[in-house]
């Protein structure tokens, strides 16, 4: 509630207007004042902040309180009468002002109600005005339209003139319109009108019948036309369908032709890539053979030592051949780059053409065609990957050739050549063996001065081996190969061996020469020695030279070692090879050492063979298929024993990863037993000559063990020897010849990796037999 400022006129009488004030009367005051509430009010704050709410709360208590009985708290005297009068006057004024405020509020409410009623009436008037305006607009439009119609009729009347009159056909009277004419006929000519009406009805009936007949005829014609149209549309649809079928048939024929053409091109491209791949493989094998021939000139191995050519002309010739090989490799690389570029351009053009054709026929291509296109693309990508892999293989082989040639030149300068002469007497052979020991000491000293040579070529040879295996279809990380893969790789390996033999012109003659030499020496030594019989159950002692070690071709896999005695008819099949070092020209020859008998159920311990071994991977001419073939030649009853071998003091353990397995006596042919006896007699003869080895230099390795040392170590397992990476295919071919000569009766049972007996717990496959190099 708000307070209004009252003027003198407002206080003296009622406000102006029709509104009349209600009856006013002052109320009696009987309430006592609440001093505590009054004391809590801050008057200054209320005046400063215009706190009307506080005034509204206290207005009733102040206006209607009684102060007559109030006394002073200090002096206990009543209130001053004058002050009391002023307070009562103020209370009356406030009460009157409240009454005026109520009257004004009621007046304002009444006026607001009247205002709302006026506004509603005004709105209704505006709506009525709008409606009337719409009606006026419609009336005006109707009036305008009628005026136009009247003017049009007037013009027509003026134009027609007298012809617009209606004349009675029964009399001469004329009327303005047809209504008047009909009225005239009904009044004057009633009978004739009925006759005329009947005639008109009859005429109308005839016309109606005629129209019905025409309608029926028209409907019949329309139905015939519709039927003809349907037949025509059906014929057109049939023709369109026939054309679509023919077009689809032609498209299918064209599609089949294109598909056959595409497959033919893909087959041609595959055949081309395969021919190129074979050509490159043959060239690589030829280059590797030439490289090995160059290396064999600097290191030719035999039973008694290393044969070296001292002529400088040969070295110059080898250097020239190496340079020619490098030039051929450069020419081949350039040719391959050109061919690769042409193939890429051709494939890009074909791809663009196929993409355009695919975009044009994308709507009609079926799912099998899309699969065929994706398969062709995968074939193309696979062929491209093979080409890239072949290019990388060529680059790696070139780097290998350069590295090996550089190493060969350095080692040839450092290592003096030793010429082993063929002497028949035992004294000359002993002198040759002593010279060979001195040569080996020099080699070890050279390697000890530069031990980095041992580890320089390991990554290169590993990469070369991995790439060659991938080129043969064996992926990286494969733990083994199946029999089907072996059968698939056998023709390729056989072809490579034949190509290797053809590329090395002196291969057959050299093998025959070695066969004759070994046969003659064996016969001479056999004549001078007596055959020592072996007790039953004791296997014949074999030379460490006759142990052929298979090579590890995949990471973390180990293969069996085949120990085969040579036959008397073909001594070349067991031609021993010296343990080769990591580099060409660094050879080492070990003499056969007797192995003492150890009583056991079926085990034959082997004395630890001295010598150095090569990294556990095959050369370029011995792929994985040869490994499997060599493993299959081992007899079934074999219990190999292996023991960890101490490492040399100059880091030779990086390449010592092969183990040695001994062959137990079993059911074999008489030829094998006789050859074992022959080898045993040769061992005993050589053992007598090597009882006192030469003095070992400081830091050297004793390559020949004494017999008593062999007896002391009879219980320790032996490790396998291993073929070096620079050996030729002579051992492989000899082993293959031996496998063919064994025949169906003497052929040993293949011992696969997956069918090992349970007693092979201490086999070379066990992880505890020897610490292995990580990744090999």
Curated annotation (Swiss-Prot):
The residue ranges flagged as biased composition, category Polar residues, are 652-683, 709-721
Positions annotated as zinc finger (C2H2-type): 166-189
Q: What is its main location?
A: cytoplasm
Q: Which InterPro entries match?
A: DZIP1_N (IPR032714), DZIP_RILPL (IPR051241), Znf_C2H2_type (IPR013087)
Q: Where in the cell is it found?
A: Cytoplasm, Cytoskeleton, Cilium basal body; Cytoplasm, Cytoskeleton, Microtubule organizing center, Centrosome, Centriole
Q: Which residues form a coiled coil?
A: 196-450
- Please indicate if the UniProt record lists Protein biosynthesis as a keyword: no
> What is the role of this chain?
Involved in primary cilium formation. Probably acts as a transition zone protein required for localization of PKD1/PC1 and PKD2/PC2 to the ciliary membrane.
Q: Assembly and interactions?
A: Interacts with SEPTIN2.
Q: What is this protein called?
A: Cilium assembly protein DZIP1L
Gene name, Swiss-Prot/TrEMBL: Dzip1l
């Amino acid at each position: 509630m708000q307070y209004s400022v009252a003027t003198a006129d407002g206080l003296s009488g009622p406000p102006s207007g029709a509104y009349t004030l209600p009856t006013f009367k002052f109320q009696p005051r009987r309430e006592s004042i609440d001093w505590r509430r009054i004391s809590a009010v801050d008057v200054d704050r209320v005046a400063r902040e215009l706190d009307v709410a506080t005034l509204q709360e206290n207005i009733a208590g102040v206006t209607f309180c009684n102060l007559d009985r109030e006394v002073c708290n200090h002096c206990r005297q009543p209130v001053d009468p004058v002050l009391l009068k002023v307070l009562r006057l103020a209370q009356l004024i406030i009460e009157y002002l409240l009454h005026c405020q109520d009257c004004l509020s009621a007046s304002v409410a009444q006026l607001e109600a009247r205002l709302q009623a006026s506004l509603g009436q005004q709105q209704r008037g505006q709506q009525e005005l709008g409606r009337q305006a719409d009606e006026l607009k419609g009336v005006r439009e109707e009036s305008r339209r009628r005026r136009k119609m009247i003017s049009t009729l007037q013009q027509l009347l003026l134009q027609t003139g007298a012809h617009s009159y209606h004349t009675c056909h029964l009399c001469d009277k004329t009327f303005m319109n047809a209504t008047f004419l009909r009225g005239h006929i009904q009044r004057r000519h009633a009978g004739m009108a009925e006759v005329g009406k009947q005639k008109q009805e009859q005429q109308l009936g005839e016309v109606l019948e005629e129209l019905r007949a025409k309608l029926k005829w028209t409907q019949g014609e329309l139905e015939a036309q519709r039927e003809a149209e349907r037949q025509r549309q059906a014929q057109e649809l049939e023709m369109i369908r026939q054309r679509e079928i023919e077009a689809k048939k032609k498209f299918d024929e064209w599609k089949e032709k294109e598909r056959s053409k595409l497959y033919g091109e893909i087959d041609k491209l595959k055949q081309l890539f395969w021919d190129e791949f074979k050509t490159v493989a043959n060239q690589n094998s030829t280059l590797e053979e030439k490289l090995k021939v160059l290396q064999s000139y600097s290191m030719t191995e035999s039973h008694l030592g290393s044969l070296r050519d001292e002529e400088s002309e040969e070295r110059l010739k080898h250097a020239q051949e190496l340079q020619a090989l490098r030039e051929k490799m450069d020419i081949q690389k350039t040719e391959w780059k050109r061919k690769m570029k042409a193939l890429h351009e051709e494939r890009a053009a074909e791809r663009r053409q196929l993409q355009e054709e695919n975009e044009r026929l994308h709507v009609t291509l079926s799912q099998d065609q899309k699969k065929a296109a994706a398969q062709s693309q995968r074939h193309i990508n696979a062929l491209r990957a093979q080409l890239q892999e072949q290019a990388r293989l060529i680059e790696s082989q070139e780097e290998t050739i350069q590295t090996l040639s550089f190493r060969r030149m350095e080692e040839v300068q450092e290592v003096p050549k030793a010429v082993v002469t063929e002497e028949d007497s035992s004294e000359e052979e002993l002198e040759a063996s002593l010279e060979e020991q001195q040569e080996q000491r020099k080699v070890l000293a050279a390697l000890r001065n530069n031990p980095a040579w041992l580890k320089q070529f390991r990554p290169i040879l590993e990469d070369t081996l991995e790439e060659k295996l991938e080129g043969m279809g064996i992926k990286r990380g494969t733990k083994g190969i199946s029999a089907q893969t072996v059968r698939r790789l056998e023709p390729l390996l056989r072809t490579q061996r034949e190509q290797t033999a053809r590329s090395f012109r002196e291969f057959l003659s050299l093998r025959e020469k070695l066969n004759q030499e070994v046969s003659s020496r064996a016969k001479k030594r056999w004549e001078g020695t007596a055959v020592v019989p072996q007790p039953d159950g004791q296997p014949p002692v074999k030379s460490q030279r006759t142990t052929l070690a298979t090579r590890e071709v995949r990471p973390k896999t180990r293969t069996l070692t085949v120990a085969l005695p040579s036959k008397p008819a073909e001594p070349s099949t067991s031609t021993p090879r010296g343990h080769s070092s990591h580099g060409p020209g660094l050879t080492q020859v070990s003499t056969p050492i007797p192995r003492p008998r150890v009583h056991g159920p079926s085990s034959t311990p082997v004395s630890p063979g001295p010598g150095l071994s090569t990294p556990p991977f095959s050369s370029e001419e011995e792929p994985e298929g040869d490994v499997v073939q060599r493993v299959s030649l081992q007899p079934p009853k074999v219990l190999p024993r292996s023991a960890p071998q101490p490492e040399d003091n100059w880091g030779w353990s990086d390449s010592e990863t092969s183990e040695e397995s001994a062959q137990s006596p079993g059911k074999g042919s008489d030829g094998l037993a006789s050859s074992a006896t022959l080898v045993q007699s040769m061992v005993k003869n050589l053992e007598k000559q090597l009882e006192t080895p030469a003095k070992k230099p400081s830091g050297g390795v004793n390559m020949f063990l004494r017999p008593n040392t062999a007896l002391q170590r009879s219980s320790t397992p032996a490790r396998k020897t291993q073929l070096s990476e620079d050996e030729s295919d002579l051992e492989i071919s000899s082993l293959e010849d031996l496998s063919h000569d064994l025949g169906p009766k003497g052929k040993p049972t293949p011992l696969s990796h997956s069918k090992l007996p349970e007693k092979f717990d201490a086999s070379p496959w066990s992880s505890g037999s020897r610490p292995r190099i990580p990744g090999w």
